[in-house]
């Protein structure tokens, strides 16, 4: 949504990879050939718009079909006004506000083989507002990683 990104976008990327790793659990997808990307969109307005889309008079696509945001919102729900507060591009904000309200899915339904902690971490990394996501230190200090964390004397 924004042209300038901070480290928060890396947390989003790790969250997407985390979700895709959850798909590799047999309990979540029994047929390995049916495993797929978490958000396999073809474009994402405004940074990578669909060049074939019909647009309104200010250049905003009239359809959101196949926009990556549609796929994201199908999972995490549409953002609230406060969750959109970081968006500075007026066209992007208008585009977001045109999405019909929908709730987040139950992550347990999508990933029945994931532990409660794994799903909690996934949800935290996939928060729409980048400033609401945990940072790397918060994630690494999460109790979920207690059994695998190595401490260094350096």
Task: Outline where the language-model segments fall.
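C-terminal lobe substrate-recognition/regulatory segment of protein kinase catalytic domains
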Residues: 48-60, 66-124
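Activation segment of protein kinase catalytic domains
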Residues: 25-42
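Regulatory extensions flanking the kinase catalytic core
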Residues: 97, 124, 131-154
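Short acidic/histidine-centered micro-motifs embedded in hydrophobic/aromatic stretches
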Residues: 41, 75, 90, 141-143
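Conserved end of the kinase activation segment
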Residues: 1-9
